[in-house]
Amino acid sequence: MNPPPHRMRVRIYDVAKLAGVSPATVSRVMSGSRPVSEGIRARVLDAARRFDYQPSQLARNLRRGQAATVGVLVSDIENPHFASMVRAIEAALYDRGTRVLLCNTAEDTQKQSSYLEVMASERVMGVVISPTADGDDAISHLIDLGVPVVAFDRPVADPRADAVVADNAAAIALGTQLLVDSGRRRIGFIGGGELLSTAAERLAGYRSAIESAGFEPLTAIGDFAVEGGRRAAEQLLTQSPDLDALVIANNLMTIGALQALRASGILLPEEVGIVAFDDPPWASLLDPALTTLAQPLREMSEAVVERLFARMADRTLPPVRICFECHLEIRQSSRGRMKSAGGG
């Protein structure tokens, strides 16, 4: 048996030709649906191994009338934003008769790669993923195997993957401008880790609005976590005692920043106004209620699932990036700064 030529995508017909059998025989061997002779089975498995061939689970499931399984990888299930979006994605998949294999990577690239290997071995029909900062090789390998991949919240580096994201830069610029218009002048920004595309985009939106207003940018990195948000707020308060507003790049860092502000005895919004990215359920319950930049999570989740099913039905579709606008939920935390009694 001669070695197969190099191919980016292998079909069942290629395996059949190399093994000297029909495609139907290859299907029987790979699925174990009917017995074949040991000699034929060995030839088919050898050809499949040479090609690194993995049969389409989509086709097999459809023939058997079985439900599809889709892998969903989330980068931080404890983050209310991701929890809400994954819940909506799962509901949309369930409504389409699809089973979900859910994995939490906890922003760990090794875990992501390990889970993607599981997805490949389980022959999932598609993968929905909010990727870690790196680990793109494992995603590309999955795409090489013919598995459709749709990224959400953050795109992946491989241009063959679809993506459903928010317009992060425009949203943060909108929130920053709201504070400028309310009379704030010393507006700080608490951003996420620099390796994440969402963090870079939100920082760019802040800088654009601040520079347009002619103000000095005041930034600190909080790594999208509660403790990081607290440290970043403390840093900004120390470096800029006249700080009068904060734009915060996610809901977890907002919690930490609020802890730091209250520990310092700072009144909200009288002394420091706040606009935060993400609109968790507790935002409206705070006192003062939190002004937020809300992502349309339900619409984004539906777009993720619709794109995945379109890709599973037609693997030749060109990849797309679907970008959603965020909207301001204006509440008390962004009210204009109040002048002190007798002030000028």
Where are the model-predicted features located?
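N-terminal helix-turn-helix DNA-binding module of bacterial transcription factors
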Residues: 1-68, 335-339, 343-344
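Bacterial carbohydrate/catabolite-sensing allosteric modules
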Residues: 1-5, 50, 88-99, 120, ...
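Short acidic/polar active-site loop segments enriched in Thr and Asp
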Residues: 22, 68, 125-126, 185-186, ...
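Amphipathic helical "hinge" segments at domain boundaries
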Residues: 38, 42, 53-126, 207, ...
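Residue-level recognition of strand-loop junctions within catalytic nucleotide-signaling folds
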Residues: 75-76, 132, 333
